[in-house]
Amino acid sequence: MNRRFFIQTSAAAATTPLLALNQTHSAELVDVNFATGKWPFRELPKLNSEALKQLGITRAITGSLEALLTRDVAAVNARLVAVCKASGGVMLAAGTLNPRLPAWREDLRRCREEHGMKVIRLHPNYHGYQLDEPLFAEMLDAILEFGMAVQIVAQMEDHRTQHPLVQVAPVDLKPLHDLLQARPKARVMVLNTNATMITTALRGCVSLWIDCAMIEGVGGLENTLKIWPIEKLCLGTHAPFFYPESSLLKLVESDLSKTQMTSMTAVNARAFLGT
């Protein structure tokens, strides 16, 4: 096999599934789990709005990787907004809050009133609080009072790839069941859930949205839909930690109907955003 033939066939293999996806989903393709900014522990692929558009992604709810370890939350959110404004409408900023910091209410006000954000993305494990603490319920209620949606990141990466001095356990999601029962109109999504979380800690959380970024295995989406409503499952890539093509290929390889595909790639995200 010569070099030119190898390159041509490899490129065709990479693009054919994405072309198949373009034929099955609607014109709108929303990624609910995208991030920008520097990650201090290793170099991540540099993905921007142009890279997303080339993959057919029309909108990406975007958080900041800087938010996990930076105390100046206001500056992090301001930089995120600047990046998203330059994306031509592709990237939708999801601000962060840290309830362990005294100015979290002011940070929330800025997110909504100054930046016009619709979503807050939370990292409880990196910011050092549990979902059963009163401060989380207080912050959740404050976010909901502003009419905003909430994303909770269950985990960022496998513990085996974490820096040995920064070992961060996944979020304990069990308290969400009672929290959501008491707040039936809350728009809450958990990102990066895996099969174990879905079948244990999140069982019965019927009003909760999840994404597909860490749903793995043969027939992963189909198996998830046996226990989770299609109306609450969204496309999420977890890029740039994961290559975005990974989640797109899950759709191509699935047996989802066109209606289910449209729900997962666009309709459900719009419902979460309240649009």
Question: Residue ranges of each PLM-predicted region?
Answer:
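Active-site neighborhood of phospho(di)ester-bond hydrolases with catalytic His/Asp-centered motifs
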Residues: 30-32, 61-64, 94-96, 121, ...
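Alpha-helical scaffolding within the catalytic cores
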Residues: 43-49, 75-80, 104-107, 174-176, ...
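Histidine-centered divalent metal-coordination motifs
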Residues: 33-37, 153
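Short beta->alpha connector loops
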Residues: 41-43, 66, 97-102, 123-126, ...
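Active-site gating/metal-coordination segments in enzymes
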Residues: 58-59, 67, 71-157
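Mid-to-C-terminal alpha-helical segments outside catalytic/metal-binding sites
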Residues: 2-28, 32, 41-59, 109, ...
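Catalytic pocket-lining loop regions of alpha/beta-barrel enzymes
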Residues: 118-119, 132-234
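Ligand-binding grooves and catalytic loops that recognize ribose/phosphate and carbohydrate rings
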Residues: 72-79, 133, 137, 157-158, ...
